[in-house]
């Protein structure tokens, strides 16, 4: 029986199968696209974009109804990769006691607002993404028009938001004052700082051991996970941070939101012929996370794989389950 998924102005209908239990065999997925670092990595970035475009075409061929939202994702990624070529951010100073708190008390290494941002690059990327958003869907186009009318030719307000760091409550307050859709405004701002955030993650990567954290929140910035990934022949399970994109190890049989390990109350389902994309349900807290098992997925981008299976999120929602960190692309 087909399921029609509506995400903003995008609609797709696909057949869905069901399953119960947990997977006990898997093979390694490819890592997400790493950020380009400096001018010498320009060609690496281009190769990554070519692979992304190829995968997008594969998904569009299989699921034509996702064409418009996938085109939007591709345009955003291309703009972000272009921004990386001239990115300049400060180094992140770390105090010795921070790592002690990380290991002994379970605090994250930094907070979201601690990521240094290239303000000028973020402002320019925001303006570019507004242009891209005009062709995304009617609601996005309307919100972009309101944003441009509010900001006008003066970048002061926008620059101030970036200078204050990522403070979601402050951003939501500004969105309300400007009578904007919070989700659209947050999406545009977060997508604009993404290159800076990824550069910050690269700075701190050597300070963390992703194999030993085993907690339900990101060891780097403290944010909740947006996706679950299965890697390596033994099927190690990793969580993907909803904010910074860092990946860390977690238990295979576990709800990452309520820590439930009872197999009887943990189950999953997947789309017909799409066993590599699963919805892991917890009957204790009635929340879910999407899991990407890249057994047959070459050079996979987890966010893209998530975006191409929004129909599964709709089915989970219909059954009364919530996703704590929903895909930001459903605007």
Question: How would you name each of these model-derived features?
Answer:
Residues 18, 294, 330-331:
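Compact recognition or signaling/catalytic modules
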Residues 199-316:
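Cys/His-clustered metal-coordination modules, chiefly Zn-binding fingers
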Residues 49-205:
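N-terminal alpha-helical interaction blocks
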Residues 26-30:
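Serine residues within intrinsically disordered or low-complexity segments
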């Amino acid at each position: 029986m087909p399921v029609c998924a509506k995400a903003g102005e995008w609609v797709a209908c696909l057949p869905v199968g069901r399953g119960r239990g947990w997977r006990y065999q898997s093979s390694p997925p490819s890592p997400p696209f790493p950020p380009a670092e400096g001018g010498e990595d320009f060609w690496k970035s281009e190769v990554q974009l070519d692979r992304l475009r190829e995968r997008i075409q594969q998904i569009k061929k299989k699921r034509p109804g996702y064409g418009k939202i996938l085109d939007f994702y591709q345009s955003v990624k291309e703009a972000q990769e272009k921004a990386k070529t001239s990115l300049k951010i400060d180094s992140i100073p770390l105090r010795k006691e921070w790592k002690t708190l990380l290991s002994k008390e379970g605090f994250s290494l930094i907070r979201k607002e601690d990521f240094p941002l290239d303000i000028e690059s973020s402002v320019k990327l925001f303006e570019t993404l507004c242009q891209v958003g005009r062709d995304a869907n009617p609601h996005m186009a309307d919100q972009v028009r309101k944003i441009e009318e509010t900001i006008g030719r003066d970048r002061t307000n926008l620059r101030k938001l970036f200078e204050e760091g990522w403070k979601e409550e402050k951003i939501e307050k500004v969105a309300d004052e400007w009578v904007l859709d919070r989700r659209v405004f947050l999406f545009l701002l977060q997508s604009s700082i993404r290159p800076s955030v990824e550069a910050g993650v690269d700075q701190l990567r050597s300070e963390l051991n992703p194999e030993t954290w085993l907690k339900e929140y990101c060891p780097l910035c403290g944010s909740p996970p947006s996706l679950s990934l299965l890697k390596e022949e033994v099927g190690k399970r990793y969580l993907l941070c909803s904010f910074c994109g860092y990946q860390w190890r977690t238990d295979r049989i576990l709800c990452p939101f309520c820590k439930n390990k009872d197999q009887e109350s943990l189950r999953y389902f997947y789309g017909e012929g799409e066993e590599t994309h699963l919805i892991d349900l917890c009957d204790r807290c009635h929340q879910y996370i999407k899991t990407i098992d890249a057994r047959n997925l070459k050079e996979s981008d987890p966010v893209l794989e998530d975006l191409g299976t929004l129909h599964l999120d709709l089915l989970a929602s219909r059954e009364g389950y919530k996703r704590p960190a929903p895909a930001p692309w459903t605007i």
